[in-house]
């Protein structure tokens, strides 16, 4: 361990011993789709010595980021891209492929870096690619076998799910169930995998993407009349509580109420489109304070009282190069100089709020967006084959943020392959230098000078 980090950790520990304020276990998502962030090493030192954040979730397996946390007490969750899963699921070669990936991406850094979770893709079930969906659980099994074979028994395997895995319902938790098909063909076996391996079932609940002006207080943990569940005789005054208990109910109906639930990401932006109601610093603080209270304080939810949940706030920093609506770039908890965007009580007692950041910019784990596309956009060609468009979505979402096309997102409606593919193809095109090649997508994309934005759905350019 570098001497400077060791001394800072010892000093931080001494300061913490004098504090009467208990530290809550909380994690954070660390994305770096920005050009103004401090180096991963300075980020790791800051989190380990100045904050109560004790775990970090990465969206890839960038070695610079993984090695930056060596010698710190921070637990790390590392992600594989969606595109890697089919090869890992292969019955004949999947285990060898999984072991090769682990040898290349984890073994050189563990145990110096405390990697505790390996995430098999992200929100795979958002896809309609049957092959990708069928690859998910076999790939998770191969990864678990490979980790054991490589001696990395402290690393657990899971995958983050979006809330669309639940069947449409009236929002009352006791009525929740998994979607038809998934509730019989996928989740019983997946939940058994989690039970057998001791890994959590990870979900990404996002009240931000589900609220309406009339439900804002319900989403932000503010006083409201709530929603009454007649089956359990419980009154819900928090949307997050209801979402978590809906997941729990669906799991319990399959006989797996004992499996741990983890929150892969959830947060609230501080800026959004002009005129959007319910977005700002106070709203972000209210939501994140409420989520920490529910997930990390031991309060739990109405159906899961006194429980804690492994939770990762979204996100560590604003990301000024993320495509999509304004809000996508403004979920950050800290500024690039490490000062808080707002106070969540995450700084250790006595910690300076303005340590000097590294002058070196963070390496970008995602393709770096080029300057403005100069009024050009990439969209799906009229008449493009639906299978091709879905493949385009699956591919592009491995590189760009696809939350806007998820249920509740600014670009979800119209819910069509043509619209969703156009949005993510354009995001990929802009992030890769807006060259004609970046819009080709095997002949299904076309460059246009007509802005395809509509309503609240803004196409980056």
Swiss-Prot record:
- State the InterPro entries in the record: Glyco_hydro_17, Glyco_hydro_17_plant, Glycoside_hydrolase_SF, X8
Mind telling me which GO cellular component terms the entry cites? plasma membrane
Catalytic residues of the enzyme: 123, 265
Task: List UniProt keywords, sorted A-Z.
Answer: Disulfide bond, Glycosidase, Hydrolase, Plant defense, Signal
User: What does UniProt give as the signal peptide span?
Assistant: 1-23
Induction description: Associated with aluminum toxicity.
Where do the segments described as Disordered lie? 350-375
Gene3D superfamilies (alphabetical): 1.20.58.1040, Glycosidases
Indicate the enzyme's highest-level EC class. Answer: hydrolase
Query: Can you summarize the PTM annotation of this record?
Result: Contains two additional disulfide bonds.
Which GO BP terms sit in this record? Answer: carbohydrate metabolic process; defense response
The Gene Ontology terms for molecular function here are: glucan endo-1,3-beta-D-glucosidase activity
Q: Report the EC code(s) recorded for this entry.
A: 3.2.1.39
Listed under catalytic activity are: Hydrolysis of (1->3)-beta-D-glucosidic linkages in (1->3)-beta-D-glucans
Q: List the disulfide bonds.
A: 378-439
Ranges annotated as biased composition (Pro residues):
356-370
The family note in this entry says: Belongs to the glycosyl hydrolase 17 family.
Its function? Is thought to be an important plant defense-related product against fungal pathogens.
**Record protein name field:** Glucan endo-1,3-beta-glucosidase
Native organism is: Triticum aestivum (Wheat)
